[in-house]
C-alpha cells in the first residue's frame, strides 16, 4: 500500500499541463473563429448596404455611397468618426468587385468599367453581384503558452446579388 503513495499527485502533475494546453489552444482557436466570423459579418453588411443603394458608381472607389457603406460596416454610423468593431480593420483593407453573369462563358465574370460593362456613369448596366474581400487578408497572431506562432491571414469573401440601379 505504501508503494502507491503519491502516485495520484504524480499523475495530476503529468496530466494538468496537457489539459491546460488543450484549454489554452481551444481559447485561441475560438478567438480566431470569432474574429473570422465578425469580419465576415462586417463584409456581409457592407455588401448588403451597397446592394440596396441607388446610383452607386462601383468604378470609383471614392464614390460617397461606397465610402458610406464601408464606414457603416466598420462602425455603427456612415461617417468615419467611430472606432472599428474589429481592432486594426481599416477601410482601405476592403476590396469591392462587381460581377455579372456571362451567358457565353456561362459563369460569373468580373464586370469591366466601361459603357458596355458596369460603369453606370457612362451608361453601362448595373452589376449582377457584389463581391467583398480583403486585399491582403486580416493577419492574426495566435499565442500558445506565451509563444507566438506564425502569423497567418484570414481571407473571408462574401458575394451578394445587387438589387440597386
Locations of regions flagged by a protein language model:
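N-terminal leader/signal peptides at the extreme start of proteins
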Residues: 1-5
Amino acid at each position: 500500500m505504501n508503494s502507491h503513495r503519491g502516485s495520484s499527485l504524480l499523475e495530476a502533475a503529468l496530466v494538468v499541463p496537457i489539459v491546460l494546453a488543450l484549454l489554452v489552444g481551444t481559447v485561441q482557436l475560438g478567438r480566431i473563429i470569432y474574429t473570422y466570423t465578425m469580419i465576415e459579418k462586417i463584409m456581409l453588411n457592407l455588401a448588403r448596404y451597397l446592394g440596396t443603394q441607388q446610383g452607386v458608381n462601383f468604378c470609383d472607389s471614392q464614390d460617397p455611397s461606397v465610402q458610406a457603406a464601408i464606414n457603416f460596416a466598420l462602425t455603427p454610423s456612415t461617417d468615419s468618426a467611430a472606432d472599428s468593431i474589429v481592432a486594426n480593420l481599416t477601410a482601405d483593407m476592403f476590396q469591392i468587385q462587381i460581377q455579372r453573369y456571362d451567358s457565353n462563358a456561362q459563369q460569373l465574370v468580373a464586370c469591366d468599367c466601361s459603357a458596355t460593362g458596369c460603369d453606370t456613369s457612362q451608361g453601362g448596366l448595373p452589376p449582377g453581384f457584389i463581391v467583398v474581400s480583403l486585399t491582403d487578408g486580416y493577419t492574426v497572431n495566435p499565442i500558445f503558452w506565451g509563444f507566438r506562432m506564425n502569423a497567418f491571414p484570414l481571407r473571408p469573401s462574401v458575394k451578394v446579388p445587387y438589387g440597386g440601379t
